[in-house]
Amino acid sequence: YEFFGVVTNLVGGWLGARLGLNRTMNLGLGLQIVALAMLLLPTAWLTVPWVMAAQALSGIAKDLNKMSAKSAIKGLVPAGDEGHTSLYRWVALLTGSKNALKGVGFFLGGLLLTLIGFQGAILAMALMLAGVLGLSLLRLDADLGRAKAKPKFREILSKSRAINILSAARMFLFGARDVWFVVALPVFLATQFGWDHWRVGGFLALWVIGYGAVQAVAPRITGRTAGRSAAIAWAAALAALPALIALGLQVQGLEWLPHVVLLGGLLLFGAVFAVNSSLHSFLIVRMARSDGVSLDVGFYYMANAMGRLVGTLLSGWLYMTGGLSATLWVSSAMLVVTVAISLALPRQA
């Protein structure tokens, strides 16, 4: 899933600049409908490889839509946006609402599954998306995001030093989250805290909803100082948290302490990470070229997906070899690298 995210963002950014963001947006919606339709086959046909293929296609669709939407904002915000405050606000709102709805989707999926069954739920989602696709085909500007000069395929790699630095920082930032959040944390909650599948899933879904809510209001938290200094300061604040959680989990003698340390630390980490994420999302849209914006945004989110891929792989391996504490220490180390990389950002960023 994450591997296809790497490829999709890189190629999708080029397609968006060449063909227009309306086409990549509609392609993403269409692919998502196809992925859902693949799951409407009789249950006996739903083998693991088939479901994995549907999941991969769904991942491609999701990244096409995310890249298209975030790139489009740069062209939709009115000219003369003093201090880029409107741009920051809209990027944060889009980023936060997307993640909050992801968490809501966990509960909505469970409700649909209970009320109308698996195939009914899949069909309902496909029909809703078909309606959204119809609106998109009718209403989206045909030239949205299309570059005046069609970029060649070799231009998919960024030539901007600032964007390369920001992309590298983003890769380590998201690797630091997923190295302990994706595999290690759910397994720890199930095996050490004795939580069942629904409790683990429900808690993490609520965490994602809260995470998205904080992302949406990030401009109010950071104020107008949304630049290089803010990116460094917020990443530095985040770097300390996994290490503090790891130290807290080593304290012996109090049965309730690990629960308070881990769950409280997770909530605080989520809030600070959400601000970092919104801040970075704003910076890439602000720094991206105006003509062919999706080339830069696609390259940046390719680095994001690469960080998530590496973090996911490390999460399972580190948990097996060193437990949750090992993943937390590596997370802190990756965040220190994020801070070091961010120091190289241009001072006017």
Residue map of PLM features:
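C-terminal ends and interior cores of transmembrane alpha-helices
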Residues: 30-45, 237-255
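Juxtamembrane intracellular "pre-TM" segments in multi-pass secondary transporters
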Residues: 137-176, 191
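Cytoplasmic helix-loop-helix junction between adjacent transmembrane helices
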Residues: 54-98
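Symmetry-related core transmembrane helices of the 12-TM Major Facilitator Superfamily/SLC fold
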Residues: 120-138, 326-344
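Helix-to-loop junctions at the C-terminal end of transmembrane segments
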Residues: 8-21, 113, 213-229, 319
